[in-house]
Amino acid sequence: MVNIRENAARILPAALMAGAALFMISPVVIVLTGSLTDGIGPYIDFFVWQPAQLRAMCNSILIALCVSVGTVLVSVPAAYVFAKVRFRGRGFLFYLYIIVMMMPFSVTLLPQYILSREIGIYDTPLSMILPGIFAPFAAFLLTQMMKSIPDEILEAVRLETDSPWGLLWYVLIPTVRPGIVCAAALVFAEYWNAVAEPLVLMESAEQLPMAVVLDTVGGADAAAYTAVILFCAVPLFLFSYFETEIMEGLGAYRLK
């Protein structure tokens, strides 16, 4: 009787976790099998016979990739300045970043629309890319990670190199790599799935990303529709691949 209870105590949690895992992965399996109902025909149609859909997918890749890479290039030096460079007004500027980050999305969308009209980038990918690059979330996240690096280590490195870029490249970037990957992945997923921004900042069908034109794809053809949905689920695979870095990066997402 004791052995039965011990076995049940071990098997039941494992069975529950396996059931939960199957339940969570079932949407991906359903979409994958649905897209292969007609073989690989829907995928061939997508890349060969549907230029509008392919263009929308390329727009999504262009916007999400440019914003994620640009965000890292801008946020890493900004985080270094906030975390390790002392100057008058640093605290005020940093908390201004936090205030902007906490603003409702709709509050910043209208200024983006007006500014894109004024500088001539309305109805182009730049209307989404430029504001996205300077979004404060990534800088805030990386600042928290860089604050945890002891100043003594940085002083020792400064004895070897006088260049702040050398310090950034050889010490800070390797140390905060999980935060960089986390920020890039989250920003990529955000702009890959963006719907409101392109609806406000773009009007030409040729400029719209896949998340917006998804409703026009497939029609009665369920296989084609599920094939496109699978392409739109790219961030899921991205998160799975970088799971460790993302979790470590989110662990540093706290005020110090």
Across the structure, where does each feature detected by a protein language model lie?
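A structural signal for multi-pass alpha-helical bundles of membrane permease subunits
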Residues: 3-256
